[in-house]
UniProtKB/Swiss-Prot annotation:
It catalyses: heme b + 2 H(+) = protoporphyrin IX + Fe(2+). Catalyzes the ferrous insertion into protoporphyrin IX. It comes from Pectobacterium atrosepticum (strain SCRI 1043 / ATCC BAA-672). One of its GO terms (molecular function) is ferrochelatase activity. Its EC number is 4.98.1.1. It is found in: Cytoplasm. Its main location: cytoplasm. This is Ferrochelatase.
Amino acid sequence: MKQEKYGVLMVNLGTPDAPTPQAVRRYLAEFLSDRRVVDTPRLLWWPLLRGIILPIRSPRVAKLYQSVWMEGGSPLLVISRRQHQALAARMPDTPVELGMSYGSPSLRSALDKLLAQGVTQLVVLPMYPQYSCSTTAAVWDGLAAQLRDNRQLPAIRFIRDYAEHPAYIAALKHRVEQSFAEHGEPDRLVISYHGIPVRYANEGDDYPQRCRATTEALIAALGLPEGKIMMTFQSRFGREPWLTPYTDETMQGLPAQGIKHIQIMCPGFAADCLETLEEIQEQNREIFLHAGGEAFHYIPALNDDPLHIDLLEQLVGKVE
């Protein structure tokens, strides 16, 4: 009987190779060319992307990356590597590789390493707690594209999401309790998720429901009154309506309601990145304090916390 060989592929979004306009432009060109991310007809989108968006946004975004860049690369890459190393250490007899949907390390390189080790049973773990067509489904598309020319395919177990997994909720709860112990209980705990266009949800993407499921499970775990926690959406892009309420507009309005002390977390991000460290911890903090807020504390992502690695290990299962 054929001996099966298991392997694990961890996948996150990706990152530029450097905080420079040129590197950011290459990354954004790949990212924003994915139809799962932007589904505007190509004849309209290509001139807009290459003629306006990339020339204007690349230098701006490069400056933002410069403000959070770490010695080993972008925060997302550095932390993803730590997560990869920690999970691999838990599973010494199972190949574990990290790939990115856009940029390096690529899905192709990660798959090549796994297949070269004779993997016949592949567990694919997109590092997105809440399913969305623009993230999780893009991993599926990328995986299929990379395997299209292979004569021999591994059996694949694809983890769609883990929005309500008990170990995920327990890890989030622990993060919140740590923050409350350090900074006191806030007037509001804000749960900010990356947004998507409303149209995507209307067309069947159940991302809003998955975000709500996480929020409701966390409310129950913390035992806080529902009015103590609010859910918002960040990082909107383009002109069409995105999921609301918007995080930045919420930050602007809360102090006028007498809410002067907030703590904010972004449970949709498995690793801290530009959207959490710069957009939330810097931009939204400034908005809140300028509007009259008095205390703003960002609760870090789960990153390589041991409780997070416990979760990842449970998700991929015992595959030795």
